[in-house]
């Protein structure tokens, strides 16, 4: 449902977009996510925005769940992106769990053992792991120089500002 809303929003702004089923171009082999880049590149070459999502995908064992976050990281790598944007419902990664008062946004996270301590409290946020998984599912991609940026996509204008390089509140993640 969310995917259709996103595609509809793009189309209403005269931005050509199409829903691309994750199962049509992604599978897992030997525990590794394999993305067939042709569908993505073909749409991008035609200036059409592919909109995909986390889903159940085929694997050599059976079926597995692939989060939208991991899909974004892996797609960025095969497409040669420098940064992955994560529009969230919060302003970024906080220095304390949500239930603790006086929390502050961490502007930049450089992955280290200490990072694990900060993110442990966020595992409960959603079924695929919350902020912890959002960041750690991209470790291999981060190691290759791709950055992540987590920001609040519900703030009007934030998505546009993030994509055009304007300064907004959020968390940069790098290795």
Functional labels for PLM-detected ranges:
Residues 1-175:
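C-terminal catalytic "cap/lid" subdomain
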